[in-house]
Every structure is written in C-alpha cells, then in structure tokens.
Amino acid sequence: MNKQFYSQQWKGVLTGFRPLTMVSPRFSMFLVPRRISCRFVHSTPKKDHTTLLSNDKLATFNVMSLKALKNECRTRGLKISGRKGELVDRILAFETSGSLSGGAAKQAARQLHISKSIRARNDIKPVDDVRMPDIAATEKSLETPEQEYIVHITPLSSSADKKPVTRLEKELSVEEVSANVPPAVSTTDHDKVIFQVDAPTDNIEVVDEEAELDADKRASENFGLHATKEELNSRDKTFLFGFAAALVGWWSLKFWDNKGKKRSLT
C-alpha cells in the first residue's frame, strides 16, 4: 500500500499533475506546479503602463494639451507626429528606458576613468589624479620666435677666441665697438682737433623775431600799394575810354548835322 502510494506521488511530481489520492502534508510542496511568468515589452497593452512611473506623473502627461506633449517629445528627441495617446506612450516609454538604463550608464561612465594598467590587474579602483597638459604654455612657445644661441667652444689659441666667426658674433662685436667710441672733443690747439665721423651734425638756426615781424609788415605794405596802383590804373583806363567814346559820339553827331544842312540847302 505504501509503495503504491509513493509511486503515484512520484509520478504526479514528474508529470506535473496532482494525483487524486490523499497526500500527506510533507509531500504537498512537491505537488504544487511552479508557474514562471515572463512579461515582454511588446506584450503589455498600451493602456496598462508600467508601474515604474508615479501616478502623478502619468496624470500630468494625460492632462497636457497636444501642443505641450509635442514640446515634451521635441525636448526628448522623440517623434512629434501622431495622436495624444501615442505621444503620451512615447514619453512614458522614453522615461522608462531612461530609468532602466541609468545604472548601466553610471557603470559605463565609471569604466571610462579606469586606466589600462588597472584594467589589466582587474582592479576597479579609479584614478586619483589626472594631469592635463598646459595648452597655453605650448601655444606661447610656438608663437615666440626662435632665438639664436652662441655655442662657445674653447679654441686652441687666445687670438682665435677673440675673433668673431658667426654672423651674430660679428653683429655683437660691431655694436660693442660703436658703443666704445669716445665722443668728439674740441681743444684750443687748432692743429690737433678730434673729429667723430659718425657723429650727427645738427644745424641750429638763430631766429630773430623782430626782423621777421618787420619783414612781414613790409611785405603787407608793398602788397597794399601794389593793389591800390592796380585799382587806380583800372579807373584811369575806364575814364579815358569813356571820354574818348563821348568825343567820338559828339563829332559824329556834328558831322551828320552839317551833312543834313547841306542837303537841305541844295
């Protein structure tokens, strides 16, 4: 009897069906079939939203107008075409995916700050200090012109050491020589006079202000006299021309009168 009972119970566990016979309490746990439920993303109906979002947030999206929902979709980079329900579904799906992928994003951001040597040792300890290159100093060094340096090599003799060889050494030697030239000195002895060839000669002129004022006055007076003479000459000319014209007119009138009298007499 017991053997038959145990065999029936064992068959029930293997097949997943509960036998019709009575079962003791200690074997009841084996008789309940285990059900594994798996829900996929696309198996959820559109109206039944996920419980990850609060009811307040869901209510706010449902209350929004179509224009406000389009603005929300635009800020999230989603498609703005469609009905109000479709826009709400897109926003909720975006919020759900963002909350689910937040942990993965943090883990990826943490992995970016781990060096290769630490990854090789399988150590998750982050880098303590990162030194960034000085970009300003690098740009400044590129902008500054290259300077010429004199590499001093000890020569075999002292005379060769004093003689300039490179172009920069020659320019420096010329500047030193011109700086060491003494200035010009005048002496009482006219036979021995020191002249400086490169000394600049400044021509200093002494200006007499009174003489210049007198010269200006004379020039102005002469100009006035010349102008008055020209005016008088022009007046005289007009008077003479007018007088001559009057004489000619008078003589012509007298001539024509005499001629008319002679014709009348004849």
Swiss-Prot record:
Q: PROSITE patterns from the entry?
A: SAP
User: Transit peptide, first to last residue?
Assistant: 1-40
Q: What is its main location?
A: mitochondrion
Cellular component terms, GO, for this chain's entry? mitochondrial membrane
Q: How does it sit in the membrane?
A: Single-pass membrane protein
All copies of domain SAP, residue ranges: 61-95
Which Pfam family is one of this chain's hits? SAP
**Subcellular location as annotated:** Mitochondrion membrane
List the keywords (alphabetical). Answer: Membrane, Mitochondrion, Transit peptide, Transmembrane, Transmembrane helix
Report which residue ranges the record marks as coiled coil. Answer: none
InterPro entries annotated for this entry?
SAP_dom, SAP_dom_sf
Q: Does the keyword Oxidoreductase apply?
A: no
So where does this one cross the membrane? Answer: 238-256
Q: Which SMART domains match?
A: SAP
Give the UniProt family note.
Belongs to the AIM34 family.
Q: What is the official name of this protein in its record?
A: Altered inheritance of mitochondria protein 34, mitochondrial
Organism of origin is Lachancea thermotolerans (strain ATCC 56472 / CBS 6340 / NRRL Y-8284)
Organism classification, top ranks? Eukaryota, Fungi, Dikarya, Ascomycota, Saccharomycotina
